[in-house]
Amino acid sequence: MKRVALVIQYDGSYFSGWQRQKNAISVQETIENCLFKISNQIIKTFASGRTDAGVHASGQVIHFDIDFLIPIDRYADVLNSRLPHTIRILESVEVKSSWHACYSAVYRHYRYVINNNKIPNLFLNKWSWHRYQKYLDEVSMSIALDGMIGEHDFFAFQKSGSNRSTSVTTIKDIKLERTEDLILIDIKATGFLYGMVRSIVGQLVLVGEKKITPDIFKDRWVLKKKHDVRESAPAKGLCFVNSVYEENIFKRINKNDLFPKFVIRGYS
């Protein structure tokens, strides 16, 4: 029996999320069905992070145990030849039986993309949130992020329906960067609450539009004012960038940002 780890990408707009669900197509079910076809074994996969419906992944990490005699480094090619074009396997490696895609991760990295141009862009529509009620003040939005790094209770940013026992988690790094009309919000944390990133982005947009101040933003999460956090960003602008592990077992992940860099030029 071998434990195999994969780095995968998927277009979340075609799936109900990572996790298996009744009467819906998930990434997990699609991959497990493919593994069954090539091995005739019922395989259970485990992911570093469970993305919601519509959320993309550029460097998701999963693992599974399998008793099937093909070279480990061939799993990517074998699976890609059978999977739909909306899922790609970038790399396959053998790992120790004690290694776990979720529990061995030091932190996860999510990125949210906002297109703040007056004119929507067809080629960015699937991968970003086109939001233009007014020009977003990225300076105020960045100021609002002050104090979020570290271990905190982010209950205000947790959507209903979570099965986590605690809303406390540790943000390793959080930053906001604007390039022309694209705003990228990067969050690295040991774990993420249900709907956490999209809730944070929804509130940051209110700051950028001068509907609330950076102090009000901070007050809402510090004082756990969940009832005031009503706005949430749509799923399509969110991407699971990668997971980082103490031992660098992959050639591509950890060293490279697998998320494409979008640039808008030519109109304003």
From Swiss-Prot:
Catalytic activity: uridine(38/39/40) in tRNA = pseudouridine(38/39/40) in tRNA
GO BP, sorted A to Z: tRNA pseudouridine synthesis
EC code(s) of this entry: 5.4.99.12
Positions annotated as active site in the UniProt record: D52 (nucleophile)
Keywords, alphabetical: Isomerase, tRNA processing
Signal peptide: none
CDD domains per the UniProt record, alphabetical: PseudoU_synth_EcTruA
GO molecular function: RNA binding; tRNA pseudouridine(38-40) synthase activity
Binding site residues for substrate: Y110
Domain of life of the native organism: Bacteria
InterPro entries: PsdUridine_synth_cat_dom_sf, PsdUridine_synth_TruA, PsdUridine_synth_TruA_a/b_dom, PsdUridine_synth_TruA_C, TruA/RsuA/RluB/E/F_N
HAMAP family referenced in this protein's UniProt entry, alphabetically: TruA
Family in the record: Belongs to the tRNA pseudouridine synthase TruA family.
Purpose of the protein: Formation of pseudouridine at positions 38, 39 and 40 in the anticodon stem and loop of transfer RNAs.
Subunit structure: Homodimer.
Name of the protein in question: tRNA pseudouridine synthase A
Native species: Prochlorococcus marinus subsp. pastoris (strain CCMP1986 / NIES-2087 / MED4)
Name of the gene encoding the protein in the UniProt record: truA
